[in-house]
C-alpha cells in the first residue's frame, strides 16, 4: 500500500491566527495537553509563544520548579494563543 501525500495532514487550523498553517512536527508536551496543542496551534504561533515565554521567565526571574510559576506561564500561554490580553515582558514591543 502506498501512502498518498495529504497537505492537510501537515497543517492545522491555528487558534491564534484563525487559518490553516503548518503544524508542529511533534507535540510540545508528552501528554494529552501536548497532543491538543499540536492539533490546534501552528508551528509559527508556538515558536512565537516560546519567545514570549522565555522573556517572561527571564524578566520575572521565574523558576520552573515553582508550581506558581508554571501555573502563571500556563495561563499566559492560553491567553496568548487565544488572542486575549496577556502579560508581556516590559522590554518587549510588538513588531510592526
UniProtKB/Swiss-Prot annotation:
Presence of keyword Iron: yes
Gene Ontology cellular component annotations, sorted alphabetically: cytosol
InterPro entries: Fe_traffick_prot_YggX, Fe_traffick_prot_YggX_sf
Coiled-coil stretches: none
A biological process from GO: cellular response to oxidative stress
SUPFAM superfamilies recorded: YggX-like
Domain of life of the source: Bacteria
Region described as Disordered: 21-40
Signal sequence, start to end: none
GO molecular function per UniProt: iron ion binding
Keywords in alphabetical order: Iron
Its job: Could be a mediator in iron transactions between iron acquisition and iron-requiring processes, such as synthesis and/or repair of Fe-S clusters in biosynthetic enzymes.
Family: Belongs to the Fe(2+)-trafficking protein family.
Stored PANTHER family: FE(2+)-TRAFFICKING PROTEIN-RELATED
UniProt protein name: Probable Fe(2+)-trafficking protein
